[in-house]
């Protein structure tokens, strides 16, 4: 296949339809892949696993080549950083897919509605067809091949468009894919910005894009012309929230690692840190020591990565110049860029203090080794600061308070969260990875990635007896009876409560009956008379849990009144169902016996739940209860009489 080159830019030209002419080589390639997909059908489990094995073996065989190519593309990049951040993460992901693929492919059974209960319902996961993958320059190997591995696992074919900013890596991807797969299975397309726009405008079955929010808008606009579903993995300003009183030596080192890996050119890199106003100086000291421990020679260290090119380097310098001009205090760690003479476009680890929203550095995604510090007075201020900005791709929280952690998790919205660390949620293969709002939508990794590249086909299998046929014309008395029964059940359980009252006289003192009645270990046996209900043994009266065997709905109960020894009441709620049971105890005139009155009401929206709580069954439950009390405390003088 003839190869050209593509530029990764802040804006792409908009290409609609097939009018540009640039797609004349792309559209036939897409057509060949789609024809092969339709001709051969979905690949089997064995074929998908074989493709994953081929990809993994090819990667490991070219490891040294990729390390050299990325070093050349960045001006300098540690081979260990490439091996860890790209090769290792990618092979872990492939191994995860290989291991779990059988489970992912398995059809999922679903519930069948009552009139057709003898039928079968399931969801089957079907390959979409041809997946388009647009990869960025910051991790050009893993961010091209991780979605490819997921697409292959889901049974698809794929076309990849890598970035022009990393030409050596792009050329290596071309040769690796050509040696491993046929062109109608996987192909790599290179070209300039116009080719990239034409690629995004192709009628793929799904388009996966990783890159900036600005380009993501252009890609989505182009895909919408063809009604192509998209997954957008974008960026954003991912905050680090450091709770007060944390061990700053460890915290600062963890933040420095997340910020300085790949020189901050990571979509989930910490973009700014929120510190309590009393801890800024201590953090700066801890940061300086942490950076020195990670990179003893500062930006001249062998393990420290350069900025990808002069253009991006100058953009970062422009952010710092703008911040200085507007009153920020800039603190560089290690030699300044001018003294890092061993390599070009290398930026020192940098802190920026006294920042405000008028600065570009607080409005734009930084994507470099520059970390602004924002101070807060209390946690609510910090959370409000995060929520006042577009939703980020990641949030990082350092803290030991369970309550504060829960506040951060529930009151902020982000693509993902790592607690007491940075970056690490990305490499958890069983967790979905994706953005929200301006940081993207859709997710990959885990079963979510497999399903993103699959069509979730609903399959309903009608068996020999079909209850739905009873509701076909000609309508008559049977139809009226069925409708009357079904609609009455729904009405009864949604609005009109079921009410049951029973009473019995137990030959025992009121104190003795009270003790037996509130002994929660006895309660499960009372419900044996109701075959739809199982009451699990509770540990205490306030933690009773009802479980309906016919449906995984839980009805949790709590004691709402306990006036010893006259009155005891519990309520139960779940899925719109509300139940209330009150036990009233009063002694007979001579005090030798006790009258026990049970009054229960049930109301809820589910028809089957109404059947489970029909009055006769509740009467049977009460009868069982009274018999148990009598056996333990004396004889029943007038047992289980409905009143």
Predicted feature residues:
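Hydrophobic ligand-binding cavity/cleft-lining segments
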Residues: 492-537, 643
